[in-house]
A protein has these predicted regions:
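Phosphopantetheine-dependent thiolation modules in NRPS/PKS and related acyl-activating systems
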Residues: 1-40, 44-55, 59-86
Length: 86
């Protein structure tokens, strides 16, 4: 799966997990996540992580997650890409 496809899937995960609806369509790789999307609070981060694990078939360790991971859609996509390549 190439990065563009992963980005689209991560966007779908965010749309579904956070119930963003059509607002998710406007997200780009540079879109800020934490602090910008009101639905993405600390509890929602757990929901998104679980959804990412289920969608992409890997497990995320607590030590793998940082604020930088959720800084932008691109940083979250890069995280998923790295996990898939590991």
């Amino acid at each position: 799966m190439d990065r563009a496809a992963i980005l689209d899937e991560v966007k779908r995960v965010l749309r579904d997990a956070l119930q963003l609806g059509r607002r998710a369509d406007a997200l780009t790789s540079q879109s800020q996540l934490l602090g910008t999307i009101p639905e993405l609070d600390s509890m929602a981060v757990v929901t998104v992580i679980t959804a990412v694990e289920e969608r992409f078939g890997f497990t995320v360790a607590d030590d793998d997650i940082s604020a930088e991971t959720f800084a932008t859609l691109g940083s979250l996509t890069d995280f998923v890409n790295e996990k898939l390549g590991a």
